[in-house]
């Protein structure tokens, strides 16, 4: 395997040379014998900031590939007492050995095992699950392997089922009814969290989001794991519900049950999806710590993008409602010219943009007030 040295953050690692695995002048990271995707640098950059605040004693990257993520955590975030890197691909495990040595890390434990098998053998304070596709096969094992009040980080790239484009796949993987709705970018993340909560409950544990976001073609989610059947029951009863959207007028709301429900505005039957998580997507105290800290990482290649994302999330995090997609709402209302988002925010007074969609707004003001602004500004 021909290797190429690359720099990401403050580390230098060897990866398969893309030129050796091109097909008709094109390259996909999955074609190489060991997976490395430079498009996920933003994901890793933000994760470096998160881990720097958590300072876990044990870090476990269960699906390490080149080892880039765990190595960056150790070098840039926090020199943990123990760094555990694993990949079931023996070629990847060998490459991890090279990359760990290349970055002067002496206390790393490297495994060449199936991720689930390893997760049922050991415990960790911080576990990272960054699979190719859905994290569902690793939810139970990662929650089980996390110590009390530990953290699990999940990446999900299978947006088709989560956003309602592939309904049967969503039902099969996430045990949720789904449709493509106006706010599906956010609802997909809530379906994912709902699935994790239900899986954790089978172990008499529960999870709460610490920080989460949507970017490019994936969701990234950090959850804190708590033990106790009572806590699991409370979280399910309080934070797992359904979501309804009116296909005629665009009114949307959380609903308690998956049953035929009429829109209170126009009387049309709701399209209902779920179950999904209805609580906050971030821990506000932790979010504040991220905002206070990220400037220390101005060397990151995606620093400006991180700054923009955190600025938007800081503003939208205080609102409890799912965002309204003004473009989709205007279409349902037969409003031909979509008003500028900034004008709608000014009209509403208490509202913000959302990172989920460029034409989305988040506010706790009522549907009627949003409609008034949309129509008055056309």
UniProtKB/Swiss-Prot annotation:
GO terms for molecular function: tRNA (guanine(26)-N2)-dimethyltransferase activity; tRNA binding. One of its GO terms (biological process) is tRNA N2-guanine methylation. S-adenosyl-L-methionine binds at residues 44, 69, 87, 114-115. Its EC number is 2.1.1.216. Pfam families: TRM. Zn(2+) binds at residues 246, 249, 263, 266. Transmembrane segments: none annotated. Residues 4-374 form the Trm1 methyltransferase domain. This is tRNA (guanine(26)-N(2))-dimethyltransferase.
């Amino acid at each position: 395997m021909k290797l190429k040295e690359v720099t990401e953050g403050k580390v230098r690692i060897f990866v398969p040379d893309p030129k050796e695995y091109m097909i008709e002048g094109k390259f996909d990271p999955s074609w190489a014998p060991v997976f490395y995707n430079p498009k996920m640098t933003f994901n890793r950059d933000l994760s470096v900031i998160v881990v720097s605040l958590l300072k876990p004693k044990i870090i476990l990257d269960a699906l390490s590939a080149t080892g880039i993520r765990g190595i960056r955590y150790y070098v840039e975030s926090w020199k943990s007492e123990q760094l555990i890197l694993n990949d079931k691909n023996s070629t990847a495990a060998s490459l991890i050995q090279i990359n760990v040595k290349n970055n002067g890390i002496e206390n790393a434990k490297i495994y060449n095992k199936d991720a689930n098998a390893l997760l049922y053998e050991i415990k960790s304070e911080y576990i990272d699950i960054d699979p190719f596709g859905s994290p569902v096969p690793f939810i139970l094992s990662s929650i089980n392997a996390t110590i009390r009040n530990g953290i699990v980080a999940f990446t999900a790239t299978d947006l088709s089922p989560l956003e309602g484009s592939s309904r049967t796949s969503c039902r099969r993987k996430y045990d949720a009814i789904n449709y493509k709705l106006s706010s599906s970018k956010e609802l997909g993340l809530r379906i994912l969290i709902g699935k994790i909560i239900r899986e954790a409950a089978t172990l008499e544990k529960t999870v709460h989001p610490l920080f989460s976001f949507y970017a490019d073609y994936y969701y990234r989610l950090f959850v804190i794991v708590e033990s106790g059947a009572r806590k699991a029951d409370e979280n399910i009863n309080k934070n797992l519900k359904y979501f309804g959207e009116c296909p005629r007028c665009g009114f949307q709301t959380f609903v308690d049950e998956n049953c035929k429900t009429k829109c209170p505005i126009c009387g049309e039957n709701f399209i209902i999806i779920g179950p999904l998580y209805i609580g906050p997507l971030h821990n506000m105290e932790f979010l504040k710590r991220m905002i206070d800290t990220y400037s220390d990482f101005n060397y990151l290649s995606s620093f400006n993008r991180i700054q923009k994302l955190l600025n938007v999330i800081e503003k939208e995090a205080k609102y409890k409602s799912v965002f309204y997609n003004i473009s989709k709402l205007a279409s349902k209302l037969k409003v031909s010219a979509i008003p500028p988002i900034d004008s709608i925010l000014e009209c509403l007074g208490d509202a913000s943009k959302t990172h989920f969609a460029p034409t989305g707004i988040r506010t706790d003001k009522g549907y009627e007030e949003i409609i008034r602004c949309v129509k008055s500004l056309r």
